């Protein structure tokens, strides 16, 4: 059984026990988060596609940790004008494990 969920503006294919890195969720470590935006559910070979979400379906995610991603460097430069701007960014994320898919 698997499902496609949407969180943080991105879509993820999830199965029970799978570990995901999603955009930062407003939850503490150890909390269980319920995701109601389930776009697709596959169970015993039968695929149910939502319009846009599957009614009554939800995924339960357990928060494992919070962290920051790899640093990316944004560098702006204008040639011959001595204009240089360097800025770094680390996107916050939440590591979750899928506990259950209810459909």
UniProtKB/Swiss-Prot annotation:
Keywords on this record?
A: Ribonucleoprotein, Ribosomal protein, RNA-binding, rRNA-binding
Q: Which Pfam families match?
A: Ribosomal_L21p
Q: What superkingdom heads the lineage?
A: Bacteria
Q: Does the keyword rRNA-binding apply?
A: yes
Q: How does it assemble?
A: Part of the 50S ribosomal subunit. Contacts protein L20.
What does this chain do?
This protein binds to 23S rRNA in the presence of protein L20.
Q: In which family does this protein belong, per the annotation?
A: Belongs to the bacterial ribosomal protein bL21 family.
Protein name per its UniProtKB record? Large ribosomal subunit protein bL21
Q: Provide the gene name from the record.
A: rplU
């Amino acid at each position: 059984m698997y499902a496609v969920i949407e969180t943080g503006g991105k879509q993820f294919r999830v199965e029970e026990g799978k570990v995901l890195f999603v955009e930062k969720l407003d939850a503490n470590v150890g909390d269980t988060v319920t995701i109601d935006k389930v776009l697709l559910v596959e169970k015993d070979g039968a695929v149910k596609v939502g319009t846009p979400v599957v009614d009554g379906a939800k995924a339960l995610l357990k928060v494992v940790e919070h962290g920051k991603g790899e640093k990316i460097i944004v560098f702006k430069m204008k040639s011959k004008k001595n204009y240089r701007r360097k800025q770094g960014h680390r996107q916050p994320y939440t590591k979750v494990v899928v506990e259950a898919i209810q459909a």
